[in-house]
Amino acid sequence: MPDIVAARRVGAMRLGRAELLSDLFNEAPVSIGVAGTSGKSTTTGMIGWILKATGCDPTVMNGAVMTNFVSPDEPFASSLVGNSGIFVSEVDESDGSIARYTPTVAVVNNVSLDHKSMDELRALFRDYVAKAKVAVLNLDNAETVALLVGARKAITYSLSNPSADLLAHDVRARTRWNLLRTDLTRRRGVRGE
């Protein structure tokens, strides 16, 4: 590849995608990393959309097209460049690059057998959660419940566990692709930060 040869010739640094992305993410004043063995892209897109719709102007890096951001100019909208200092990114465990991230907020949807052994996955997610200022954890998945022990501060969510900080109920899908309506109950003492 001519570009790599030219870069070597001038001594330019060469970074892989995970290295570059984690460096940018870790430098952000507020970083929200979305992890889990499934649902990362959808959750990243939802968080990005909520932040954008509420005027927060986030930067978002996703592993899939974010339907709400698709336009004629951006048909493959898997990223969004904002100007607020908030960086939302899908964080991947399959290649171990999750270990490179130090999030302000670590969201973990679920942990299940995928790409690595359960022991490896538990260690990766445990270390990821331990580095975050706040962990957002799904109480409907036993493996994410186990991550509570290592979290500095945790906010929990659930579709069925009434002890969760945030409990979604009466979930209704309106269309096949991108409209979901739910009622959310917040437990007393959980601030809306």
Regions inferred by a protein language model and the residue ranges of each:
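A conserved short coil-to-beta-strand element within the FAD-binding core of flavoproteins
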Residues: 171
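Ser/Thr- and Asn-enriched, surface-exposed coil loops between beta-strands
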Residues: 162, 174-176
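Short aromatic-glycine-enriched beta-strand elements
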Residues: 178-181
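A cyclin-like helical interaction fold
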Residues: 125, 158-160
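Active-site loops of AMP-binding adenylate-forming
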Residues: 65-66, 161-163
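Phosphate-binding loop of NTP-binding sites
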Residues: 1-153, 183-191
